[in-house]
C-alpha cells in the first residue's frame, strides 16, 4: 500500500498490483463489505468434504482448529482447506491510520475499512499461490493460465478414469496374460540391455578407431599441405625454367637463322663488290682509272688499288697459294708489293700524281708485278680446273691485257707512254678477271 497526503483534511490510500506494480483503483464494493460478504469470500474452496463421524469432532475438540479432511469421490482425491482467521485483532498485518481530519470518526472508519481490505487480500494470497491484489490485465492472464492448468488436470483425470475402468474390467485370466507379457517384456528388456551394452562396447572401440583414423587423417592432411606447397614451388620453378628454355630456344632459333643466312652469304662477294661505272671498273664503289673527261682523284685510285690487293691476298690465302717473286702487302690506300728476291725493294701501288708521276716508274713496276700475281693465281686454278678460263688473257712480260673476245686489241697496264683511256680499260679488264676468280673461289670453297 502507498499513501500520500492530498490536503490537510484528506488522506489518499492506494493499492498496487503484486505482479506489474501498477497502482490500483479498488471497486466501490470494497467500501461496503459486511461480515456476511467477508465470510463468503473467505469460505473454504471445497465445501462438500465430509469427515468421518467422530474423527472430525475429536480433532475439533483437541485442536480447536478447523479440520484438514481428505475425501474421495468418483475416484478423485479432494482435500478440505480451512479458511484463514480474518478477524483476529492480533494480526501482524493490521494497522491504524493516523492523520489530521476534521472528524475523528471518519478517520476511524477509513482505518477500519483499509484494515479489512488488507486482511481480505492477505487471506486470498494465503489460500492460493498468487499474491493479491491484481490488476485487470494480470487477472486475465492468470485466468488464462488457470484455464490451461484446469484443462490439463481434467485430461489427466479422464485418463485416470479410463485406466481405472480398464483395471476394474480386467479378470484374472487377463491379469495372468499381462504378467506373462510383463515377463516377456522384462526378458526382452534384458536382451536389449545386453545388446545395448554390446553396442556401447562396439561404440567405444569404434570411437577409439575413429580417433586413430582422425589422427591419421590429420597427419595426412598436413603431409598433403606440405606436398602441395612443395608442388607449388616446383611448379613455379618449372614455369621459370620453361620460360628460360623458351628464351634459349628462341635465341638458338634466331642464331640458327643467322647462321643459315651467313652460310648462304658469299663472304667475298659481300666484302668485295666489283662492278663498273661507265668506262671505269669499280671495287667497293672506288673507281680504278683516270680519264681526261673524268679526272678521278688519286686518293680514290689508291683506295681502289688497296681493295684490289686485299682481294687477291684473300683469294690466295683461301687457296693456300704462295706467290713467287712477290708478296702482297695490303695496306689500305698505301698498299704495296714486296720483292722476294730483293727484300729492300718495295713496289708501291699508290701514286700522288704531279711531274714525279711521269718520271717515276715504280708505280708501273708495281702494277706489272700485281698482274704477275694475278697470272699465278690463274695458273694455280687451272691446275685443278682445266676448264677454267679468264675472259681476258694477260701478257705479264709486256704488261698488257688482251681483249680476246672483243676488239682483239691489247691494253697496257702501265701509265708511261700510254693514254689514260687505254690504262683505264686495262684496269677494268683486270678487275673483271679478278671477279671471275672471286666467283670460282666462292663456288669451290663455299662450305670450307
From Swiss-Prot:
It is found in: Cytoplasm; Golgi apparatus, trans-Golgi network membrane; Endosome membrane; Endoplasmic reticulum membrane. Residues 423-448 are annotated as: Required for membrane-association. This is Beclin-1. The modification Phosphothreonine is found at residue 117. A motif (BH3) lies at residues 106-125. One of its GO terms (cellular component) is cytosol. It is a peripheral membrane protein. Changing residue 259 to A: Disrupts homodimerization, no effect on interaction with ATG14 and UVRAG. The modification Phosphoserine is found at residues 14, 29, 88, 91, 94. Plays a central role in autophagy. Acts as a core subunit of the PI3K complex that mediates formation of phosphatidylinositol 3-phosphate; different complex forms are believed to play a role in multiple membrane trafficking pathways: PI3KC3-C1 is involved in initiation of autophagosomes and PI3KC3-C2 in maturation of autophagosomes and endocytosis. Involved in regulation of degradative endocytic trafficking and required for the abscission step in cytokinesis, probably in the context of PI3KC3-C2. Essential for the formation of PI3KC3-C2 but not PI3KC3-C1 PI3K complex forms. Beclin-1-C 35 kDa localized to mitochondria can promote apoptosis; it induces the mitochondrial translocation of BAX and the release of proapoptotic factors. Phosphorylation at Thr-117 by DAPK1 reduces its interaction with BCL2 and BCL2L1 and promotes induction of autophagy. In response to autophagic stimuli, phosphorylated at serine residues by AMPK in an ATG14-dependent manner, and this phosphorylation is critical for maximally efficient autophagy. The keyword Mitochondrion applies. Expanded poly-Gln tracts inhibit ATXN3-BECN1 interaction, decrease BECN1 levels and impair starvation-induced autophagy. One of its GO terms (biological process) is JNK cascade.
Amino acid at each position: 500500500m502507498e499513501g500520500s497526503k492530498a490536503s490537510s483534511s484528506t488522506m489518499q490510500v492506494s493499492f498496487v498490483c503484486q505482479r506489474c506494480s501498477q497502482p490500483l483503483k479498488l471497486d466501490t464494493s470494497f467500501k461496503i463489505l459486511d461480515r456476511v460478504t467477508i465470510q463468503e469470500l473467505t469460505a473454504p474452496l471445497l465445501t462438500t468434504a465430509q469427515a468421518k463421524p467422530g474423527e472430525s469432532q475429536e480433532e475439533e475438540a483437541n485442536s480447536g482448529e478447523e479440520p484438514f479432511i481428505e475425501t474421495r469421490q468418483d475416484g478423485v482425491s479432494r482435500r478440505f482447506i480451512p479458511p484463514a482467521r480474518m478477524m483476529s485483532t492480533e494480526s501482524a498485518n493490521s494497522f491504524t491510520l493516523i492523520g489530521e481530519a476534521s472528524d475523528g470518526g471518519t478517520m476511524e472508519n477509513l482505518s477500519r475499512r483499509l484494515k479489512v481490505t488488507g486482511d481480505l487480500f492477505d487471506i486470498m494470497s494465503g489460500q492460493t499461490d498468487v499474491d493479491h491484489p491484481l490488476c485487470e490485465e494480470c487477472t486475465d492472464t492468470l485466468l488464462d493460465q488457470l484455464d490451461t492448468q484446469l484443462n490439463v488436470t481434467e485430461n489427466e483425470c479422464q485418463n485416470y478414469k479410463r485406466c481405472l475402468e480398464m483395471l476394474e474390467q480386467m479378470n484374472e485370466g487377463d491379469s495372468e496374460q499381462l504378467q506373462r507379457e510383463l515377463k516377456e517384456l522384462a526378458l526382452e528388456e534384458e536382451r536389449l540391455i545386453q545388446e545395448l551394452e554390446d553396442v556401447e562396447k562396439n561404440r567405444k572401440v569404434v570411437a577409439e578407431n575413429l580417433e586413430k583414423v582422425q589422427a591419421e587423417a590429420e597427419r595426412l592432411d598436413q603431409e598433403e599441405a606440405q606436398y602441395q606447397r612443395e608442388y607449388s614451388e616446383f611448379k613455379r620453378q618449372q614455369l621459370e625454367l620453361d620460360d628460360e628454355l623458351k628464351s634459349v630456344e628462341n635465341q638458338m632459333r634466331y642464331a640458327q637463322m643467322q647462321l643459315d643466312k651467313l652460310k648462304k652469304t658469299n663472304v667475298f662477294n659481300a666484302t668485295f663488290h666489283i662492278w663498273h661505272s661507265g668506262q671505269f671498273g669499280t671495287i667497293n664503289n672506288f673507281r680504278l682509272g683516270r680519264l681526261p673527261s673524268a679526272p678521278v682523284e688519286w686518293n680514290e685510285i689508291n683506295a681502289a688499288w688497296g681493295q684490289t690487293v686485299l682481294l687477291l691476298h684473300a683469294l690466295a690465302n683461301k687457296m693456300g697459294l704462295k706467290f713467287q717473286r712477290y708478296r702482297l702487302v695490303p695496306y689500305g690506300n698505301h698498299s704495296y708489293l714486296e720483292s722476294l728476291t730483293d727484300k729492300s725493294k718495295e713496289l708501291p701501288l699508290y701514286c700522288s700524281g704531279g711531274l714525279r708521276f711521269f718520271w717515276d716508274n715504280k708505280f708501273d713496276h708495281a702494277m706489272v708485278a700485281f698482274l704477275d700475281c694475278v697470272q699465278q693465281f690463274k695458273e694455280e686454278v687451272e691446275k685443278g680446273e682445266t676448264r677454267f678460263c679468264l675472259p681476258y688473257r694477260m701478257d705479264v712480260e709486256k704488261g698488257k691485257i688482251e681483249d680476246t673476245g672483243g676488239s682483239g686489241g691489247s691494253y697496257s697496264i702501265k701509265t708511261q707512254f700510254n693514254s689514260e683511256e687505254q690504262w683505264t680499260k686495262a684496269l677494268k679488264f683486270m678487275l673483271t678477271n679478278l671477279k671471275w676468280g672471286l666467283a670460282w673461289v666462292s663456288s669451290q670453297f663455299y662450305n670450307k
